[in-house]
Amino acid sequence: MASRFQLILSTFVVIAAVTMLPRPCASIEFHRKLSSWSNGGATWYGAANGAGSDGGACGYQGAVFQAPFSSMIAAGSPSIYKSGLGCGSCYQVKCTGNSACSGNPVTVVLTDECPGGPCLSEPVHFDLSGTAFGAMANPGQADQLRAAGVLQIQYNRVPCNWGGVKLTFVVDVGSNPNYFAVLVKYENGDGDLSGVELMQTGAGAAWTQMQQSWGAVWKLNAGSALQAPFSIRLTSSSGKTLVASNVIPSGWKPGMSYISTVNF
């Protein structure tokens, strides 16, 4: 009986040990799920050390050259530009398939649209500024990497972090007492917006939904004179909300920038 019991016990121990061994396929699948990198394509446009185009389809204008964007920008294929709703979103991009690639990720912000050519040939494509494309290279090999022209890359959506920079609202030059349009820039976190609302001052003031005009510009055609100061409520693409109270003052002027005291 004792020997039979020992045999059964030994068999149980062996089975238990085998069961507890890691399964290669399960382990690989687990790590694949943890990875947030996806495959895409990249080209570059504009000057070799420039910011792509002057402003781009999001409407940021000269801000693309200046800090905090600092020329590290991208024009996105339709799948990530999202008819302008992707403006301001941040991505890490890296390349490994060229000898000049460093393999280290760099962060870019979406400021423009790439509507045709290679941007339609694959699900996700980044047409990077020359500066951003070269930033993926090994030290001293930026020109060599740019000479490749087209790359397969890996990309990852990441939160935007503009340090101490606050939300900025640039009043569109076409605005008037009855029509108000504003460019929103430097949103931390999601970076892109799904909704913008305005509250004017006065009796019965309430939040009024603005409409996306184009790119990162939102508009409200009130049909009657709006009473400033205005508060603006932003909803990010993931549903987070933030209020910039009285950020647009009385006596606002078209073309002027107004900096809030808040950010996501």
From Swiss-Prot:
Expansin-like CBD domain span: 178-260
Gene Ontology biological-process annotations: plant-type cell wall loosening; sexual reproduction
The UniProt record lists the keyword Cell wall biogenesis/degradation: yes
UniProt KW keywords: Cell wall, Cell wall biogenesis/degradation, Disulfide bond, Membrane, Secreted, Signal
One Pfam entry name: Expansin_C
CDD domains for the chain: DPBB_EXPB_N (cd22275)
InterPro entries attached to this UniProt entry: Expan_Lol_pI, Expansin/allergen_DPBB_dom, Expansin_CBD, Expansin_CBD_sf, LolPI, RlpA-like_DPBB, RlpA-like_sf
Protein's membrane topology: Peripheral membrane protein
SUPFAM superfamilies: Barwin-like endoglucanases, PHL pollen allergen
GO cellular component entries: extracellular region; membrane
Disulfide bond entries: 58-87, 90-160, 95-101
Keyword Phosphoprotein in record: no
SMART domains: DPBB_1
Localization of this protein: Secreted, Cell wall; Membrane
Domain Expansin-like EG45 intervals: 55-165
Family per similarity comment: Belongs to the expansin family. Expansin B subfamily.
Protein name: Expansin-B15
Source organism of this protein record: Oryza sativa subsp. japonica (Rice)
Lineage, top ranks: Eukaryota, Viridiplantae, Streptophyta, Embryophyta, Tracheophyta
Name of encoding gene: EXPB15
